[in-house]
Every structure is written in structure tokens, then in C-alpha cells.
Amino acid sequence: MKLEQCIVGRDHTDPRKWHHGDGRDGREHRTAPGLVGGSLAGRDPPVERARGDGDGGHEFMSVVVEGGELREQLLGLRIGIEEDRHRDERQAHHRPYRRSTRCTAGSLYIGDFIAGRTTVVGAIGAGPPSQRRFAFPEVNDCGPSSNIFAKCCAPGTILFGNIFDLPNFPRMSDVRAGSNDPPGKYLCLTICGYRKPGMSEEDYRHHMTKISAPMTKDLMVKYGIKRWTMIHSPAVTRTLMDQLYDSQMVNLADFDCFSQVVFKSVEDYKRMKEDPYYKEHLFKDHEHFADTKKSLFVHFMPLPPPLGPCPGS
């Protein structure tokens, strides 16, 4: 995917406010052709950063790329938010998409222009210090889309981090109403979990299988969960990947647990999470052995019935 322009900013409730502004160097900053007019032709160097005030006084920082693959041209976007978050903003300015802006829950919006013609808008709420992956509510018919890593580092402050291409990102317009429960199919929630920092693999496995699992299984049955699996992935088994390495098997996953929950309706799983026992015991128990700030969740995936027994689960 080729990225021609990205813009981030503060309280962008109106996309028209992103279209232009005066950069600090006095030059007018315009969007890519096909949006509001203007041209990026002839700009040098290929990657250019400009900061200024857009319509209504909204600060923004933009990155302009004239051609080139995203991963090749914008390697500077792959930054470590945690290590950078206490740096003075001036020191961080040489890195694209590295700046902070104030926000309140539900009021901050981020936007970018994909392929120089498409506006993507997503609402973000302030929250606890944790890295989050955001899916945008609408991608206006642009095909392959993008996503942004953001980190809430302090109340009212958010730091923007990596932007990367996410092929075949689904548009909300493609998702039919009620399609969370497709007829005749089960749903599967997949979780890639990490153990609590400082906890040994032995203690992690013991807590997961001997303490957490027994507390969970009866509740799963109560709410009609069809299958539940928790698979521990210790570091020693990852070394086996050395024997399977080839050009198609290069990247090694680092999660400690792979878990799947299969159910008929998403409402069943939601009701289980609302159960007083879950809130009082299971929710708190997760913090005792899991690094919940790093856990990754995959969208619900339909599975065809019937499901047979799952030995050892």
C-alpha cells in the first residue's frame, strides 16, 4: 500500500478542519490531490513533516510521502512509545507521528488520508497506561486500510505511535447488522496472552491450569460456552521453530498462552462477563498471573458446526 499523506491532530470533529494550514516555515500545507486540491508534486525531500494550525486553530502534524512502500519509506514510524514518552517534544520531532495531544474520553479523533484520497476517522478515549490497537468505524471505500497504535500515558494525554498498513481491513459498511451471530455457525474468540512480568513459567502454568481454569469451567458451562481451550507456550518449545525455519516462517510469536472460546451467540459470552462471580473472582484473578496490558484479541471468527469434544481442554 502506498501512503501519500497522514495527518493527526486534536479534537478533529470536522474532517474539513484537516485540509490545510500554515506550517511554521510559512508555507501553505495542502492535502494530496483528489481531496481539496493542491499538489504535492516537486516537494523535496520525499518525506516531509510540517506542523501548524489548521482551521479553527487545531494543531496538527503531517507526514507527506510521494510514492514508495510504507514499510520502506516510513520506517521512522516504527517507534518505541514507552521509551520515548518522557522525552521533550522537541527531541522527538524528528520522528514522524511522535507527538502528544490532550484529550478527554470520547472526544479525541484521529484521521489519516490513505492513498491520498480517503479520510479515516476514529474516536479514542483517554484511559489507563496501555498500548491499544484501534479499528476505525468507517473506511470510506478505500480498499486496504491502515491502523494506528496509540498509548494513553497519563490522564488527558495520548501519544501517537506506529501506523502500519493492514491489508483487507473490513469496512463497517461491509458488516451486516446482526452478523455477530451468523445463522448456523458458532463464534470463536481467540486470545494471545502474556504472563505477568517477573512470574516464572512454572508459576504461570500452575496458576493458569490449577487455579484459574477450575474457577472458570463451571461458569463456561452455565452460559452455554461450547468449547474453551488454554494452551501454554513455554519458551523451550519456541526453540523448536529453528528446525522449521524457512523464508515463509520467519517471524516467531512471543505470547505465553493461546486461548479460544467458542460460543453460539456473542450475547452468551457477554452475559458470562456480567455474572457477579466473574466480576468478583475471575476478572481480578487475571491480574494475578497475566499481563493483561499486552493481551491480544482476535475478532470473532465463525466456525462451522458441529464441534466434537476437545480432549484435554
UniProtKB/Swiss-Prot annotation:
Residues 1-31, 45-56 have a biased composition (Basic and acidic residues). Residues 197-292 form the EthD domain. It catalyses: atrochrysone carboxylate + H(+) = atrochrysone + CO2. One of its GO terms (molecular function) is oxidoreductase activity. Keywords: Lyase. It is an enzyme of class 4 (lyase). It holds the Pfam family EthD. Residues 1-56 are annotated as: Disordered. Transmembrane segments: none annotated. Its EC number is 4.1.1.-. Belongs to the tpcK family. Decarboxylase; part of the gene cluster that mediates the biosynthesis of geodin, an intermediate in the biosynthesis of other natural products. The pathway begins with the synthesis of atrochrysone thioester by the polyketide synthase (PKS) gedC. The atrochrysone carboxyl ACP thioesterase gedB then breaks the thioester bond and releases the atrochrysone carboxylic acid from gedC. The atrochrysone carboxylic acid is then converted to atrochrysone which is further transformed into emodin anthrone. This is Decarboxylase gedI. It comes from Aspergillus terreus (strain NIH 2624 / FGSC A1156). The gene is gedI.
